[in-house]
């Protein structure tokens, strides 16, 4: 069995530092790098791409809503054409640094409120996917496991990766429990590891109300924005390897 570990990185901005990128990069195989609209700036983008190169981690674009103040976690009502061009613009910005460092772009994973909005908005999804396809149809689109956007992406001829979340609780319908609700974020590293092993080996996990949710796990999102999160990521990788699950990049998984 094989699985990819991804993390959202490059989310500092100017003098504001967010995340422990160098620490979490030791344990992951794919980096989702902010493209300057919800977080990141040109210096941070290049620094993070170079860090990924030095640590042999694959690079993906992490585009979001143009909302630095809200960190891309606030919904915006976009037309399909706006979404298409917003995505293409951000991918292009990151790709300049990717190319400058002699790398290729592996995937695109939308950020925050945009990621969640795709699950319930087909027109928005099509716009985002058209933006990705405009750039390169061979790039992998990362979306919420077993969700409609992944079906649409496959119908459009794009490669897809089903993403699960290590430290988040699930609703019975397979969506993530809102961060505003109690129990939405799981902090115990042993519980996190057992849930992820269940997702990979058993094809699902118990939802917040105890119902079984079927999931496909191609890539696992882990966090590295505080020392405990890095500790959890290190422990999770160790436990997965102990279970005989090989940690590889999306590029090796998705052909």
Curated annotation (Swiss-Prot):
Annotated organism of origin: Thermococcus sibiricus (strain DSM 12597 / MM 739)
Any single biological process term in GO: carbohydrate metabolic process
Pfam family, one: LamB_YcsF
InterPro entries per UniProt: Glyco_hydro/deAcase_b/a-brl (IPR011330), LamB/YcsF/PxpA-like (IPR005501)
Taxonomic path: Archaea, Methanobacteriati, Methanobacteriota, Thermococci, Thermococcales
Keyword line: ATP-binding, Hydrolase, Nucleotide-binding
Molecular function as annotated in GO: 5-oxoprolinase (ATP-hydrolyzing) activity; ATP binding
UniProt protein name: 5-oxoprolinase subunit A
Enzyme class: hydrolase
Gene: pxpA
Summary of subunit composition and partner proteins: Forms a complex composed of PxpA, PxpB and PxpC.
Similarity comment: Belongs to the LamB/PxpA family.
């Amino acid at each position: 069995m094989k699985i990819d570990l991804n993390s959202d990185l490059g989310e500092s901005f100017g003098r504001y530092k967010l995340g422990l990128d160098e620490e979490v990069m030791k344990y992951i195989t794919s980096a989702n790098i902010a493209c300057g609209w919800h977080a990141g700036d040109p210096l941070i983008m290049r620094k993070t791409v170079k860090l990924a190169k030095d640590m042999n981690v694959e690079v993906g674009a992490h585009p979001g809503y143009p909302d630095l103040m809200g960190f891309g976690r606030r919904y915006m009502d976009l037309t399909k054409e706006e979404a298409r061009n917003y995505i293409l613009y951000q991918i292009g910005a990151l790709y300049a640094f990717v190319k400058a460092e002699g790398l290729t772009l592996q995937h695109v994973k939308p950020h925050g409120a945009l990621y969640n909005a795709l699950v319930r908005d087909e027109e928005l999804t099509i716009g985002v996917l058209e933006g990705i396809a405009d750039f390169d149809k061979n790039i992998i689109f990362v979306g919420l496991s077993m969700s409609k956007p992944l079906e649409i992406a496959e119908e459009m001829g794009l490669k897809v990766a089903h993403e699960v979340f290590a430290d988040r609780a699930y609703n019975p319908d397979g969506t993530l429990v809102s961060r505003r609700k109690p129990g939405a974020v799981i902090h115990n590293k042993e519980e996190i590891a057992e849930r992820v092993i269940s997702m990979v080996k058993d094809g699902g996990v118990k939802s917040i109300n105890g119902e079984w949710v079927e999931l496909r796990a191609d890539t696992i999102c882990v966090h590295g924005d505080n020392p405990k999160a890095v500790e959890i990521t290190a422990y999770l990788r160790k436990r997965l390897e102990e279970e005989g699950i090989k940690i590889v990049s999306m590029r090796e998984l998705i052909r």
